[in-house]
From Swiss-Prot:
Motif ('KMSKS' region): 257-261
Designated name of the protein: Glutamate--tRNA ligase
Alphabetized CDD domains for the sequence: GluRS_core (cd00808)
Role played: Catalyzes the attachment of glutamate to tRNA(Glu) in a two-step reaction: glutamate is first activated by ATP to form Glu-AMP and then transferred to the acceptor end of tRNA(Glu).
Record gene name: gltX
Primary localisation category: cytoplasm
A GO-annotated cellular component: cytoplasm
Amino acid sequence: MSVRVRFAPSPTGFVHIGSLRTALYNYLFAKKSNGKYILRVEDTDQSRYVEGAIEGMLRSMAWAGVHHDEGVVFTGETLGQKGDFGPYIQSERLEIYKKYMDILLEKGHAYYCFCSKERLDEVREKQKVEGLNAGYDGHCRNLSKEEIEEKLNAGQPYVIRLRLPENKDIQFHDIVRGDVVMNTADLDDQVLMKSDGFPTYHFAVVVDDHLMEITHVIRGEEWLPSTPKHVYLYEAFGWEAPQYVHLPNILNADRKKLSKRQGDVAVEDFLKKGYLPEGLVNYIALVGWSPEDNNEIFSMEELEANFSLERVSKSGGVFDVHKLNWVNGHYIRESSVERITDLAIPHLIEAGYITESDAQERYEWLKDLVSVLQDRISYVAEIKEKAGIFFNAEIELKDEESKELIQVEHLPQLLDVLKAKVEAAEVIDEEFGKSVFKEIQKETGIKGPNLFKPIRVVLTGEVHGPDLPLVMKVLGSKNILDRIEYVYDLIQSMK
């Protein structure tokens, strides 16, 4: 049987970075196996449904380059579906679930439960006081057929629960974790169908995975404790269970599960900050999977060729934003200046440095600006911090060293010569920037750091930074002269 895998998110909000990794691993395994990757929407919990979440998820996955073969898709501006195993939205499959629930009831592997919320709360409170594991106490498990009919005819609300056998070991093999065994004494009779007629995740996922011929279930480790119930459902229906892969959690630096309280966790957050899709995908692939060699830079095609489930880790991987920035910075440096300029323009507008008309009229100049900063940013939004030296009328002295350099005795001499050279120049380009320092050195006898460092501080306010000839080209004659005058005044005020 050919490989078929699925990513099955719930439309409850933003796409978590962990969800992107789950989708990515499913996609990569399908590609490596010449199989199919399906995207199914699990919206059985209608109380948590968020309008627009499906569309947002599809946009995030398209941005990341994680494309599915079957499932929910955009057809123009609206949602559609493609594939032969649909519907791919669970709320459109209610009749299918009812059919298979009737089979389960008929076989005696499920039962009606008429317990009220108040009774269930009392049971849980009693279990808590007595130090027992929380779970359903089986109150409705052995109702007679007549009692059930009477309650149904009276219109009593109900749910349908899984009837687990008593004291039975349920075993399954996980490709990452090996053999897993759990006894039904440690499980409770899970609700399979809610009172609103919607199935719970545990029932719908088994029916859907079977009918869609899913061969491998690749999902987060939070589903590991529920898997014995799913395995038992396959057994109850007489179906062959898929192979399971439970992925390790993505952790914060303190090794707790990645949380929005401690930083960005939504794919949209990274997109807005100007991370490149290839940078985020490359990095997130490495959080929980280790390649055979020490290489850390992988294109999507290289990931498709190298990925294997056998090299997925059991233990959680730490999300290291510094490592992400290093990987993403690599892709920024490898990108064309046009691409990064186009991505940078909204951030420069947001910072108030340029207007939309500036973006069109001064595009070539903006490309020059970006080319100066491109190898100094880890994500595109960072350009807002770095670009101020080209827009602010006054320099800002960043540290003690820059403040000391602005007071060196020979600085006025350097500024006098630099000012004269700039005023005499027909154009300030990179060639001018390279030649002017040789001329200043020749005329003043000042060279090396004593020449370059003070002038860099005058032009940028910083001791270190991009190549000075490039900086001068982007600043242009007026800005250079304005800064020289500003520093003249600054020197006078310090006396």
